[in-house]
Amino acid sequence: MSELRKRNQAAIADLSENIEVTETVELTEKKPETTKSTKGHIIDLIICVSGIYASFLTWAVLQERIATTPYGPDNKIFRASLVINTVQSFLAAAVGYAYLQYKQSRRAAKGLKKNTTVFDSMYTLKQLSLVALSQSLASPLSYTALKYVDYLTSILAKSCKLIPLMALQVTLYRRKFPAYKYAVVVLVTIGVSMFTIFHAAPKKASGAGSEHQLYGLGLLGISMLLDGLTNSTQDQIFRKNADITGPHVMCGLNLLTGVFTTVSLLTFSRPQLDTAIAFIRLHPEIMRDIVLFGLCGAVGQVFIFQTLEKFGSVVLVTVNVTRKMFSMLLSVVWFNHRLTLGQWAGVAAVFGGIGFEAWMKMKKN
């Protein structure tokens, strides 16, 4: 039962991993700005990051409840993670559209152009479809990989998401980054990896034989590439269309993801849908937790896509990969927990990378 709960919890955690993504003081890759404008960007970044972190805390509570709490006298646990993902996608699409209407109404009130069309061109539709497809495939691959690789390998892979992201931006979309940006990415990746290595207790995967580990590593690698494709393509959408905002992408992406996962539930994953319907009939209270989980995810996505629109995917992914480390640092302060020497070295590497980027940005401005 503990193994089942661990897998189910990992699967639901991947739902937030897909939409989430992170924190550095690199504000944008646009032209140098005035000090006043830079301060405004810092405030915006703090608000976005605080919103993302707060939403993760709420997600964690509801995730724990759905993944581990037995429902009813028969003590059944809900295992239909794809159903949860589908509900969350449609709820986030609705919240995104409401937020889009609000932001565009404010633009119109200022005499600016109003654009409430989510798919304003075939290019936008194609790019969002690509993102939705890659995002929908990445989570199941990552979850399946847990059967063949150990826990430490899995979380180390998640710590290295910045590398495939930048690699795809350079090779696929011909983006150019200053040399210091590569150094920052390496420092942050090494720091988070060290923090993970010197903390995680080894946990065996259910199928962790040597003959299966190569297969599991392959699944993890494909999942990381799909994550990189998701985030780099989102960046490209904003760069190619000045009228596209965070709410546009949030609404369109979640709508398409919901459609894809619904098709999957009606075809390849029909047994999961049937099981979920039967479970909900017996334990209707599960719907309350699923809807609350979806709404919390939708609110979190408002901050996520605001970060993506204003600061880019590199910042967003950095927030994601450093989130666990900052959470543990808070526990050190509040509960007097102790970190190992290796973990402190990892923290120093992360803050060194962030501080170096901040210094380069101020020097540039």
Curated annotation (Swiss-Prot):
The keyword Endoplasmic reticulum applies. GO terms for biological process: UDP-galactose transmembrane transport; UDP-glucose transmembrane transport into endoplasmic reticulum. It is found in: Endoplasmic reticulum membrane. The keyword Glycoprotein applies. Glycans are attached at N115, N231. One of its GO terms (molecular function) is UDP-galactose transmembrane transporter activity. Keywords: Endoplasmic reticulum, Glycoprotein, Membrane, Sugar transport, Transmembrane, Transmembrane helix, Transport. It is a multi-pass membrane protein. GO terms for cellular component: endoplasmic reticulum membrane; Golgi membrane. InterPro entries: SCL35B1-4/HUT1. The chain crosses the membrane at residues 42-62, 80-100, 182-202, 206-226, 249-269, 289-309, 315-335, 339-359. Belongs to the nucleotide-sugar transporter family. SLC35B subfamily. May be involved in specific transport of UDP-Gal from the cytosol to the Golgi lumen. Involved in the maintenance of optimal conditions for the folding of secretory pathway proteins in the endoplasmic reticulum. This is UDP-galactose transporter homolog 1. The lineage of its organism: Eukaryota, Fungi, Dikarya, Ascomycota, Saccharomycotina. The gene is HUT1.
